[in-house]
């Protein structure tokens, strides 16, 4: 067992086949596994693969991705983790994924490193979205054989972090509950001069969003109305954070309105999306944080 690398997986009503496959892959790659469960509707302990080698933390209610990750981080650090890697419940990794990331970090003295992502359905690379200090976004398109590069942000799944980063930057922001958690934390790292190393030779299959629709050339992720609430509200909360570029925060507020308008125009439960957007806007302006109205 590689005792200094811990994997933190946050679950919420997971598809057991995918989750168990990920756990098996991590165990085969000599990684300790910590599962933090956000109130799954069935007893997870009896259904996990190799449960005696998995540390399962069951929360009494949905505490959100940020708090669940923090609980997993603290447990891992208490057990002596030197590096922590995060995964979604439906993530899948290839052979030597953990070893390659860890070796790269050691060889290049990188504090944070992550893979590139391949769309599960369309089999193309997702571009990496780099956010500059002035708030402008830059899409970095990944090509086969590309050399490693640095980015200000990445998604949490598949990202490996050295323990000292948490000592310098702090934990995930529990005020945000779910959306923008990884973006805000990465921008906090950027504020301390810590960038994410992206390694194109290390790949991970990923699916973003429940589904999406393409309107006027724009891919709009279609989440539930409640999930849209957090997306919209948190865009306003970003305006309150000094390390988040103002231009980025304004962009997210504007785009949240555009996206909601397009979702209302194309989806059946229009009234529910409209209500959630109005409530999210009001709560965001008032500074309502955490799970707010809907954590249970």
UniProtKB/Swiss-Prot annotation:
Q: Which GO terms describe its molecular function?
A: glycosyltransferase activity
Q: What class of enzyme is it?
A: transferase
Pathway listed: Bacterial outer membrane biogenesis; lipopolysaccharide biosynthesis
Top-level taxonomic group = Bacteria
Keyword Manganese listed: no
Q: Any idea which UniProt keywords this protein has?
A: Glycosyltransferase, Lipopolysaccharide biosynthesis, Transferase
Gene Ontology terms: biological process: lipopolysaccharide biosynthetic process
The record ties this protein, via Gene3D superfamilies, to:
Spore Coat Polysaccharide Biosynthesis Protein SpsA, Chain A (3.90.550.10)
What EC number is given for this enzyme?
Answer: 2.4.-.-
Q: Which NCBIfam families match?
A: rhamnosyltran
Give the family, as the similarity comment puts it: Belongs to the glycosyltransferase 2 family.
From the Swiss-Prot or TrEMBL record, give the protein name. Answer: dTDP-rhamnosyl transferase RfbF
């Amino acid at each position: 067992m590689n005792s200094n690398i811990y994997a933190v997986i946050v679950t919420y009503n997971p598809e057991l086949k995918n989750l168990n496959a990920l756990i098996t892959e991590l165990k085969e790659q000599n990684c300790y596994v910590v599962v933090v469960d956000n109130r799954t509707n069935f007893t997870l302990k009896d259904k996990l693969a190799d449960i005696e080698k998995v540390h399962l933390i069951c929360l009494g209610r949905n505490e959100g991705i940020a708090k669940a990750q923090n609980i997993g981080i603290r447990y891992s650090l208490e057990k002596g983790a030197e590096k922590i890697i995060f995964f979604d419940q439906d993530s899948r990794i290839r052979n030597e994924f953990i070893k390659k990331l860890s070796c790269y970090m050691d060889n290049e003295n990188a504090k944070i490193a992550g893979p590139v992502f391949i769309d599960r359905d369309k089999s193309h690379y997702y571009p990496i979205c780099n956010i500059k200090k002035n708030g402008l976004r830059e899409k970095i398109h990944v090509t086969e054989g590309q050399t490693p590069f640095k980015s200000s942000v990445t998604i949490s799944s598949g990202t490996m972090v050295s323990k000292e980063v948490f000592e310098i930057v702090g934990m995930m922001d529990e005020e945000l509950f779910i959306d923008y958690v990884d973006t805000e934390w990465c921008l906090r790292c950027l504020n301390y001069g810590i960038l994410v190393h992206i390694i194109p030779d290390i790949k991970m299959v990923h699916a973003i969003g429940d589904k999406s629709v393409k309107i006027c050339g724009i891919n709009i992720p279609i989440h539930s109305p409640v999930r849209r609430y957090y997306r919209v509200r948190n865009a306003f909360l970003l305006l309150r954070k000094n390390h988040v570029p103002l231009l980025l925060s304004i962009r997210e507020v504007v785009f949240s309105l555009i996206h909601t308008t397009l979702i209302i125009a194309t989806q059946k439960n229009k009234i529910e999306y409209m209500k959630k957007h109005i409530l999210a806007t009001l709560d965001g302006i008032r500074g309502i944080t955490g799970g707010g109205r809907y954590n249970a």
